[in-house]
C-alpha cells in the first residue's frame, strides 16, 4: 500500500470521529468482525473525513478506528484497520469496489479547498494494523503530526492575507491630502 501512496497513485485518510461521539473516541460504535482468512468486516459511519472520496487517485486507503467483537469498553478497546475504497487483487491491481460509501459532503466554514465527507462502511473488507486494542496509539501518532500541519496552514493563510492587505494599503489612494494639494493621499 505504502509505495502507491508515496507515488501519488493512491491517497489516504484517517477515520476517527462518529456522529454520536464527537471527540470522545471511547464511545465509537464502528464494528470489526473477524473473518476466517484474517481479514475483518468493518461496519459503521465516520464523519469529517478529509478527502474521503474523490477520483483524483486510483484508490483511497482509509485508516479506520473500530472495535473487535470482544473489545473492552472505552478507548482501551479500539483497534486500527486499513480499509481500501477498492479491494486489491493478488497481482496488486485494483479489484472490485469495497463496502465504503459516501453518505454526504460536509459543509465547512474554512479551508474550502479541502473537502470533507461522511463515510459509511458496510461490511467493508479491512486489515488490522498493529496489535488489537492498541489502535488509538497508532492513530494519534499521525493525528499529532496533522495538528501541526493544520496550524502551519493557518499561519500561511494569515501571512498571505496580511501581506496582501499591506501591499494594497500602500497603493490605494484615499481622499484629499491634508496639505491642501489637489492630489490624493495614500490610505
Where do the protein language model's features map onto the residues?
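Structured core elements
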Residues: 13-16, 29-33, 41-43, 48-49, ...
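Short Gly/Pro-enriched turn/cap motifs at secondary-structure boundaries
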Residues: 20-23, 53-55, 72, 108-115
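A glycine-rich, basic-preceded beta-loop-alpha segment at the flavin cofactor/substrate interface
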Residues: 48, 87-103, 108, 115-146, ...
Amino acid at each position: 500500500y505504502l509505495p502507491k501512496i508515496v507515488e501519488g497513485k493512491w491517497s489516504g485518510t484517517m477515520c476517527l470521529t462518529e456522529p454520536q461521539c464527537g471527540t470522545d473516541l471511547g464511545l465509537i460504535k464502528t464494528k470489526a468482525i473477524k473473518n476466517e482468512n484474517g481479514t475483518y468486516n468493518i461496519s459503521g459511519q465516520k464523519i469529517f473525513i478529509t478527502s474521503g472520496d474523490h477520483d483524483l487517485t486510483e484508490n483511497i486507503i482509509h485508516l479506520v478506528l473500530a472495535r473487535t467483537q470482544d473489545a473492552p469498553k472505552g478507548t482501551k478497546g479500539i483497534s486500527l484497520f486499513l480499509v481500501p475504497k477498492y479491494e486489491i487483487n493478488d497481482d496488486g491491481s485494483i479489484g472490485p469496489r469495497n463496502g465504503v460509501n459516501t453518505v454526504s459532503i460536509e459543509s465547512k466554514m474554512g479551508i474550502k479547498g479541502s473537502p470533507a465527507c461522511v463515510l459509511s462502511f458496510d461490511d467493508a473488507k479491512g486489515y488490522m494494523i498493529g496489535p488489537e486494542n492498541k489502535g488509538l496509539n497508532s492513530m494519534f501518532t499521525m493525528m499529532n503530526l496533522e495538528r501541526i500541519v493544520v496550524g502551519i496552514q493557518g499561519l500561511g493563510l494569515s501571512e498571505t492575507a496580511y501581506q496582501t492587505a499591506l501591499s494594497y494599503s500602500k497603493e490605494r489612494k484615499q481622499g484629499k491630502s491634508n496639505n491642501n494639494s489637489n492630489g490624493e493621499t495614500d490610505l
